[in-house]
């Protein structure tokens, strides 16, 4: 690999890392290309050389994070697990990605249609994992419709908790703080 190619890859990686930190601290909508260039100590033109538009840069970061979240969710939330282990793993994955998910849902109305579709697909995948887990652990016999109504009720509460997050630090996990309430709701709905 040539020196120029290596330098381009390092610059691209730097832009992605610094922009991800800015997004973490300020949200997707409040990050400007000027701030990104200042944070990276490069010109705005370099950002556009690598990503063409700020939207492409943000989409790259968001889609990468969505992919990582979906991968971890599928690895940790295996439908054949007991309900308790499944729920514990789900909450652990949510806590791991809490700041990202909170920002994502707060800015959802302003994101591109392609990103919204990716998020909807992720939600469908998650709901299907829950449905399969419920079917594999039939403590309470629910119809398919009732199962999905209960799953939607559960997710709306998790979603609300993510929207309530105000301070974006690793130590300030709203899901961790409300874990007991989330578990209690889950048990009320599914046991």
PLM segments and residue spans:
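C-terminal peripheral helix-coil segments that are non-catalytic and often amphipathic
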Residues: 92, 128, 132-136, 153-191
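Short amphipathic helical patch at the helix-1/turn junction of helix-turn-helix
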Residues: 27-28, 48
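Amphipathic alpha-helical packing segments from all-alpha helical-bundle domains
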Residues: 70, 113-140, 145-149, 180-183
